[in-house]
Amino acid sequence: MSTFHFDLVSPEMVAFSGDVDQVDIPGAEGDFGVLAGHAPVVAVIRPGILTVTAGANKQKIVVLGGIAEVSDKGLTVLADVATPAPDVDLQDFAATIQTMEQQIPGKVGDELDRAIERLDHFKSIQHELNTTAMH
C-alpha cells in the first residue's frame, strides 16, 4: 500500500507528523478516509475520533473541530484540539459533557441546535472512548 505524509497540528503542539497508509477523519459532512492519491479537498472537521493507520499500527486521536486539507503534498489537519485517545481524562470529559447539558436550557433557536449537535458529538466520542477502554 502506498503511503503519504500526514501532519496533525493543534495550537498546543504537533500531535502527529509522518508517513501513513490511511487517515479516517470525522468530517462535518460525514466521516471520510484519506489514502495516497486522494483528490485535493478542504473539509471542516467535527468533534470526533481521527484514526491514523501506519502499517499494522492504528492510533486514535480525539479532535474537537478543525480543518483538513488534502493536497499533492499529503494531508494536513489543523485541529482546534488534538489529544491521543489514551491521554483523554474520561472524568474530565464526562464533566465537560455534564456542563454542556446544563447549558442547553438557556439556549434557543440556532444556538440551541448547534449546542445539541456539539453535545451529541461529545457523547459519541465518550461512548467510543469508554468502549475502547474496556478492550
UniProtKB/Swiss-Prot annotation:
InterPro entries in UniProt: ATP_synth_F1_dsu/esu, ATP_synth_F1_dsu/esu_N, ATPsynth_dsu/esu_N
Compartments (UniProt record): Cell inner membrane
GO molecular-function terms, A-Z: ATP binding; proton-transporting ATP synthase activity, rotational mechanism
Membrane protein topology class: Peripheral membrane protein
Keywords annotated in UniProt: ATP synthesis, Cell inner membrane, Cell membrane, CF(1), Hydrogen ion transport, Ion transport, Membrane, Transport
Superkingdom of this protein's organism: Bacteria
Cellular-component GO terms for this entry: plasma membrane; proton-transporting ATP synthase complex
Primary localization class, coarse: membrane
Pfam families, per database record: ATP-synt_DE_N
CDD domains tied to this protein: F1-ATPase_delta
PANTHER family associated with the record: ATP SYNTHASE DELTA/EPSILON CHAIN (PTHR13822), ATP SYNTHASE EPSILON CHAIN, CHLOROPLASTIC (PTHR13822:SF10)
Subunit structure: F-type ATPases have 2 components, CF(1) - the catalytic core - and CF(0) - the membrane proton channel. CF(1) has five subunits: alpha(3), beta(3), gamma(1), delta(1), epsilon(1). CF(0) has three main subunits: a, b and c.
Function summary: Produces ATP from ADP in the presence of a proton gradient across the membrane.
Family, as annotated: Belongs to the ATPase epsilon chain family.
Name this polypeptide is given: ATP synthase epsilon chain
Source species: Rhodopseudomonas palustris (strain TIE-1)
Encoding gene per record: atpC
